[in-house]
């Protein structure tokens, strides 16, 4: 909870325009929420990205007026249980519209996943869509760890419209240097991550045999057998 409190302090600082719709920092706020699931957000090439939008409510009615938003773009499933819902409900309770999106080719989103390659353009298009919604005050911030931090860097580099705050934690930065290799050495942990993360792609979910193959490589013995064949 302390981390959430510190994050809310930062968001309130950068979102000074939020007005009296946003409560003071602290524990859970005064508002309830309603959820629009799998909203299709169009990209410039016609691909639609699945997006969940949590709206603050009062007396079971959505708050009126223009509100700030928090955007999270993730390859790890926007509906990943309590980790997501608790954070979304927390921020929404303080008057923020909270937006979770599956990145391209992941889970319920269309397209093919290319690791962080499309996230700048897709993030820009998502931000442009967001600030043009009737409920938006034109400003939003982002937060998240690891790859979710990398999507923030990608959007910042694209100068995404309306983006006022990023809080990347332990985020990916230079994929050419800190990805498959570290100072020239192949990173086995990253290879394991690829097979684990690969199971969540839209194409993989549509092809059970592909999903099983990727899952089998998570087992250390299977990976060892494969690597031994490369010698």
Where are these regions (language model features)?
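Accessory cap/linker subdomain of secreted extracellular hydrolases
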Residues: 93, 157-231
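Alpha/beta-hydrolase fold nucleophile elbow
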Residues: 134-147
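Short glycine-enriched nucleophile-adjacent loop
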Residues: 147-160
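Cap/lid segment of the alpha/beta-hydrolase catalytic domain
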Residues: 58-132
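Bacterial N-terminal signal peptides
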Residues: 5-14
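N-terminal cap/lid segment of alpha/beta-hydrolase-fold proteins
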Residues: 24-65
């Amino acid at each position: 909870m302390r981390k959430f409190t510190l994050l809310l302090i930062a968001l309130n600082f950068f979102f000074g325009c939020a007005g009296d719709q946003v409560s003071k920092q602290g524990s859970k706020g005064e508002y309830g929420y309603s959820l629009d699931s799998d909203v299709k957000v169009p990209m410039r090439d016609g691909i639609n990205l699945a997006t969940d939008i949590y709206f603050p409510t009062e007396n079971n009615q959505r708050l009126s007026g223009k509100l700030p938003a928090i955007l999270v773009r993730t390859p790890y499933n926007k509906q990943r249980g309590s980790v997501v819902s608790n954070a979304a409900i927390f921020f929404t309770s303080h008057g923020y519209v909270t937006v979770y999106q599956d990145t391209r080719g992941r889970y319920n989103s269309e397209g093919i996943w290319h690791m962080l390659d499309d996230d700048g353009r897709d993030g820009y298009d998502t931000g442009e869509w967001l600030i043009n919604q009737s409920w938006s005050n034109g400003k939003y911030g982002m937060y998240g760890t690891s790859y979710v931090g990398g999507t923030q860097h990608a959007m910042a580099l694209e100068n995404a419209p309306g983006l006022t705050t990023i809080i990347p934690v332990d985020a990916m930065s230079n994929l050419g240097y800190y990805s498959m290799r570290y100072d020239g050495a192949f990173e086995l942990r990253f290879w394991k991550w690829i097979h684990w993360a690969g199971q969540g792609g839209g194409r993989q979910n549509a092809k059970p045999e592909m999903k099983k193959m990727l899952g089998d490589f998570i087992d250390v013995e299977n990976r060892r057998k494969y690597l031994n064949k490369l010698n």
